[in-house]
Amino acid sequence: MKNLLLKPIKNSKKKFDITPQSAHWKYVGFKLFHLEKGDDIKDKTIFEESIIVFIEGYGEIEVSGKNMGELGSRTSVFEKKPPSGFYIPLQTSWSIKANTKLILAVCSAPGKEGFSPSIIKSDEIKLIERGKGSNKRFIFNIAMEDNPIANSLLVTEVFTPPGNWSSYPPHRHDENDFPNITYLEETY
């Protein structure tokens, strides 16, 4: 990625569209959508799986032609309530219609067969405290290895109190040397 400072896409519901190719990565993709009430978006996974995180607002989700109902758990990310989301396996069409102003994050990575579409309920996501002092932060584990709803995606939301650090102690994920280091591609 030549330019590390990305700016929102103008005049588009899709504000960011980061692909493995555009970032010169192997796996991770990320899209961010800002929808107004009544707007809709449609997409289809091919070789990738996705987790759609409802950052702010509420919307109806349809997966493979089946209405899965309304998702959303907050009107502002700063409410510090857990988000809700939806797991989309590979080769699956999906659409979302905004019932309110809606911000969506679409996290993606290569997938494998054998996983099913599933709702990620906000009341099943627990708040975890990590670190101490100025290194304290709060984590919502949306999809992690202890809740294997996805093949290769790990998705969290982090809240860092004002004046605190989010990534301490210093660490890296640029090689596989388990259990010392694991290779991960991360977006923040």
Question: PLM features: what roles do these ranges have?
Answer:
Residues 30-34, 51, 85-87, 106, ...:
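Conserved hydrophobic/aromatic beta-strand scaffold that supports enzyme active sites
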Residues 73, 77-115:
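Ligand-binding loop in jelly-roll beta-barrel domains
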Residues 79, 137-142, 146-153, 161-188:
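Double-stranded beta-helix
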Residues 101-162:
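Surface-exposed beta-loop interaction hotspot
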Residues 1, 34, 64-65, 102-104:
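Cytosolic regulatory regions built on CNB/CRP/Popeye-like sensor folds
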Residues 1-42, 49-60:
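Hydrophobic, proline/glycine-rich low-complexity stretches
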Residues 18, 29-46, 68, 158-181:
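Conserved short histidine dyad/triad with adjacent acidic residue
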Residues 46-69, 88, 162-163, 175-188:
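Glycine- and acidic-residue-biased ligand/ion/polar-headgroup-sensing regions
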